[in-house]
Amino acid sequence: MTKSNGEEPRMGGRMERLQQGVRKRTLLAKKKVQSLTKEDVKSYLFRNAFVLLTVTAVIVGTILGFALRPYKMSYREVKYFSFPGELLMRMLQMLVLPLIISSLVTGMAALDSKASGKMGMRAVVYYMTTTIIAVVIGIIIVIIIHPGKGTKENMYREGKIVQVTAADAFLDLIRNMFPPNLVEACFKQFKTSYEKRSFKVPIQSNETLLGAVINNVSEAMETLTRIREEMVPVPGSVNGVNALGLVVFSMCFGFVIGNMKEQGQALREFFDSLNEAIMRLVAVIMWYAPLGILFLIAGKIVEMEDMGVIGGQLAMYTVTVIVGLLIHAVIVLPLLYFLVTRKNPWVFIGGLLQALITALGTSSSSATLPITFKCLEENNGVDKRITRFVLPVGATINMDGTALYEALAAIFIAQVNNFDLNFGQIITISITATAASIGAAGIPQAGLVTMVIVLTSVGLPTDDITLIIAVDWFLDRLRTTTNVLGDSLGAGIVEHLSRHELKNRDVEMGNSVIEENEMKKPYQLIAQDNEPEKPVADSETKM
């Protein structure tokens, strides 16, 4: 009884303190609202103009797109209508190439080999951890919800799929890391293609054939050989920036420049200036971004097929992917950021709002890269040495949303075909989905191409990818947003873990500047002593 009586006053005291705290905060909020002036409102709107305009563009674009759907616009009319959005994509893609190269070179050059090695290891561990978690979430969600229940005969198919083997895709990934021509890597990447070739195969002789009497020699040759057709891999290329090759080269180049000390100073200054110039161009393009996003979203909604085809299994598949991406983006990534940094992840994510909306509109993590740089460095104050190193690499190889989608979609296709996967096959899917997401380019709908590798690894029919193409344009935007969020939070985590190395580097740079100035002083004094004294002209001489 005594214990319960003692607890009641404590509970009452806590409730009173809580109520007092709520009252104080309410009064403070009222005072702030009452003290607001027109200037305060204007300054707030000006500071958040980009975000407000971008959010408005998404809402207006969605409404406009659905409003224009009943007019059944032709393909040509849709292309004309989407032209402002196409211009935005072109502007952003124009800046991606110089931005990746300049940011990586300057980022690596600003770090010593020890710091860059530690930072690189932390970034890789983060990338692999989040990608594996995303794959596991995708597999668990699709097994629990089971969206593929039923048959595939009633499902809508769209498009054709190009076959590719897992071995060739993996070798292409390695080949693209080492481009033979850097100029060509700016607009082309290696891709194995297949062509049909005929081979003459000798037929083993048997007793019947040996016993036969053949008078004609040519007839004998035709009898002893047969023609076999086979699809063989041949070297090829596809249009598009070889981002992986440029990332590898830029990192190595920046590392070498950083170790060249004074000899590399001119190159460091050049790439620093280039990076600064690109970021100023980004600041200009950001004002056009809301208009471009509006027409991109509206045009895509007008262009999409009849909503009637998205029913049953496909609707459940769409819901399953959205749930998986939400769990990863809203719960896992912020929780990981909080556990490592002990900071509020939602404040950090708030500074990324425009980058996330741009990713939703453009459906390309590479095209969003300039905006992501701007948001992280200006809104969230992330060290430029971190963003220049982590973001270009992350936009190339860290694709959490793509990995989740590929694992989930592969098991969905297995369910549609009533194909029971064992534990070993699920592990195979998880490994290949992780590897395939690394090789997926940061371009729209790149996940569909790498999906072939995942399906081939467990013997699933690759033609069934056509079952999910109808909704991929929408899911691709959500995947891209998740990818950009993962890269950005990764930059924040790596900065927190590398703060001591960055401080030490700042101290070293400060000491080196002081030493240089001290070294210059004796020479300046000697030069001053050796200078002949100039006669001082008086006013009379001047006159």
Swiss-Prot record:
The protein's name: Excitatory amino acid transporter 1
Family classification: Belongs to the dicarboxylate/amino acid:cation symporter (DAACS) (TC 2.A.23) family. SLC1A3 subfamily.
UniProtKB keywords: Amino-acid transport, Cell membrane, Chloride, Glycoprotein, Membrane, Metal-binding, Phosphoprotein, Potassium, Sodium, Symport, Transmembrane, Transmembrane helix, Transport
InterPro entries associated with the record: DAACS, Na-dicarboxylate_symporter, Na-dicarboxylate_symporter_CS, Na:dicarbo_symporter_sf
Function: Sodium-dependent, high-affinity amino acid transporter that mediates the uptake of L-glutamate and also L-aspartate and D-aspartate. Functions as a symporter that transports one amino acid molecule together with two or three Na(+) ions and one proton, in parallel with the counter-transport of one K(+) ion. Plays a redundant role in the rapid removal of released glutamate from the synaptic cleft, which is essential for terminating the postsynaptic action of glutamate.
Location of Phosphoserine modifications: 512
Spans within the Extracellular topological domain: 69-86, 146-236, 298-318, 413-425, 460-472
Main location: membrane
Tissues expressed in: Detected in brain, in Bergmann glia arborising into the molecular layer of the cerebellum (at protein level). Localized in brain and is highly enriched in the Purkinje cell layer in cerebellum. Intermediate level in lung, low level in spleen, skeletal muscle and testis.
GO cellular component, one term: neuron projection
Catalytic activity: K(+)(in) + L-glutamate(out) + 3 Na(+)(out) + H(+)(out) = K(+)(out) + L-glutamate(in) + 3 Na(+)(in) + H(+)(in); K(+)(in) + L-aspartate(out) + 3 Na(+)(out) + H(+)(out) = K(+)(out) + L-aspartate(in) + 3 Na(+)(in) + H(+)(in); D-aspartate(out) + K(+)(in) + 3 Na(+)(out) + H(+)(out) = D-aspartate(in) + K(+)(out) + 3 Na(+)(in) + H(+)(in)
Post-translational modification: Glycosylated.
Disruption phenotype: No visible phenotype. Mutant mice display normal locomotion, motor coordination and learning, and globally normal glutamate uptake in brain vesicle preparations. The decay time of glutamate receptor mediated excitatory postsynaptic currents (EPSCs) in cerebellar Purkinje is slightly increased. The decreased rate of glutamate uptake in retina Mueller cells from mutant mice suggests that Slc1a3 accounts for about half of the glutamate uptake activity in wild-type cells. Mice deficient in both Slc1a2 and Slc1a3 die at about 17 dpc.
Listed Pfam families: SDF
Species annotation: Mus musculus (Mouse)
